[in-house]
């Protein structure tokens, strides 16, 4: 949360350099505050588990959040009861006339398929296009991040030689990215995927910034320069036992799966996993909500559409 101080206090400049948000008294007295409206596009088959993980991550912020759950209407869920979806979820058709301060698009177990062959791809494309005028900032996770990067910036995914499976240490490439405020210089985050994206294409795109990654994971966190798109290729939201459940599931299927890296003490699946990413999850989601949504989204939420028009108009002046 911002700290309110007297205008022109000398400490303001120093604190701002450290990504500590300071608000002068004049701005604070005129600031309009309302709950944040966040839309969660839950593409995972285990919807209850995923929604719980996301809710837990969002709940660490002192900001009030109104969360709307959405499932794709173009695919019938095989793992979640239809009555559950009708009770707690909405469809795109039901929300397309509304506006949201933020949107979260989860991962999905379809990464080995070309995007266009995923049965709900046309609907997801429609949602992402709609989000340009109806959502202030979007947070993409794992396959969702790959899908968003492909749709908005034309960077496709590629299959890795071996599945990236475990908890990995990452470097921060930008000196002071506000999204990573409070992170240690190196941090840990789970990954569970067969595909990756090109670091070179990300670095060559002048509308993107690579914030964090490592040699084994490649890109881990990327943002668009206008802060409208945040791409996280790992799973900061994972529970302590999520990788273990995935490992046991694949073992039962008879799959040739390696023990998750940097997860079990001494790589022994009989021992309780080591949690290294809990603070990362809290900081990542809280920073996104605070700096990329709360501090920037208009109080009159419908003005998001006008802001998109103004951005496009300004962009056209430089082309």
Mark where each language-model region is.
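Acyltransferase
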Residues: 2-28, 44-45, 236-319
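A short, charged/proline- and glycine-enriched loop
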Residues: 31-38, 99
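A short, Lys/Arg-enriched amphipathic alpha-helix followed by its capping loop at the start of a domain
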Residues: 33, 53-65
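Pocket-forming structural segment of enzyme catalytic cores
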Residues: 43, 151-242, 313-315
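A short beta-strand-loop structural module common to alpha/beta enzyme folds
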Residues: 64-76
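Glycine-rich, highly charged phosphate/nucleotide-binding loops
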Residues: 80-98
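Cysteine-nucleophile active-site neighborhood
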Residues: 105-174
């Amino acid at each position: 949360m911002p700290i309110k101080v007297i205008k022109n206090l000398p400490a303001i400049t120093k604190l701002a350099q450290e990504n500590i948000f300071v608000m002068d008294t004049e701005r604070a007295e005129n600031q309009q505050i309302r709950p944040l409206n966040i839309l969660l596009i839950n593409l995972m088959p285990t919807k209850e588990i995923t929604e719980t993980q996301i809710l837990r991550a969002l709940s660490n912020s002192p900001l009030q959040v109104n969360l709307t759950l959405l499932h794709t209407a173009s695919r019938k869920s095989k793992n979640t009861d239809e009555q559950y979806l009708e009770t707690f979820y909405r469809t795109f058709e039901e929300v397309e006339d509304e506006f949201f301060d933020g949107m979260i698009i989860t991962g999905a177990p379809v990464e080995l398929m070309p995007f266009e062959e995923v049965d709900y791809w046309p609907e997801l494309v429609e949602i992402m296009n709609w989000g340009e005028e109806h959502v202030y900032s979007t947070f993409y996770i794992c396959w969702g991040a790959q899908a968003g990067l492909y749709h908005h910036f034309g960077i496709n995914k590629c299959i890795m030689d071996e599945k990236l499976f475990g908890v990995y240490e990452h470097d921060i490439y930008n000196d002071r990215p506000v999204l990573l405020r409070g992170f240690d210089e190196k941090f840990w985050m789970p990954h569970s995927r067969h595909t990756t994206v090109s670091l070179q294409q990300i670095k060559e795109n002048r509308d993107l910034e690579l914030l964090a990654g490592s040699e084994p994971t490649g890109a881990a966190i990327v943002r668009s320069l206008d802060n409208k798109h945040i791409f996280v290729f790992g799973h900061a939201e994972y529970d302590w036992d999520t990788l273990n459940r995935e490992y046991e599931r694949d073992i039962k299927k008879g799959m040739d799966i390696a023990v998750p890296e940097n997860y079990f003490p001494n790589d022994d699946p009989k021992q309780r996993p080591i949690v290294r990413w809990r603070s990362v999850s809290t900081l990542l989601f809280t920073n996104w909500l605070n700096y990329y949504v709360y501090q920037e989204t208009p109080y009159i939420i419908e003005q998001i559409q006008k802001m998109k028009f103004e951005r496009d108009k300004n962009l056209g002046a430089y082309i």
